[in-house]
A protein has these predicted regions:
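Positively charged, low-complexity terminal tracts
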Residues: 1-16, 20-72
Length: 72
């Protein structure tokens, strides 16, 4: 996770249905999807784009769960 960087708050207000659907999407996107969708030539502070995408997805899942949207 991005412990060495300043975090950027991203305020987002969603209707309940969109938040539920987004949490389902976040649950279903896997590491293999990040591998397939990322560039192998892009790096962020020495980390591959795939790994940064995967980390961001985990942060999104945690934020959704904290807001009460944690699909099984």
């Amino acid at each position: 996770m991005a412990t060495h960087q300043t975090t950027i708050p991203i305020p987002l207000s969603l209707p309940r249905d969109e938040a539920t659907a987004l949490s389902e999407l976040a649950k279903r996107v896997g590491y293999d999807d990040c591998v397939r969708l990322s560039s192998r030539f892009v790096f962020y502070t020495g980390r591959s784009e795939c790994d940064v995408m995967w980390s961001a997805l985990h942060m999104l899942r945690a934020a959704l769960a904290e807001a009460g949207f944690a699909p099984r």
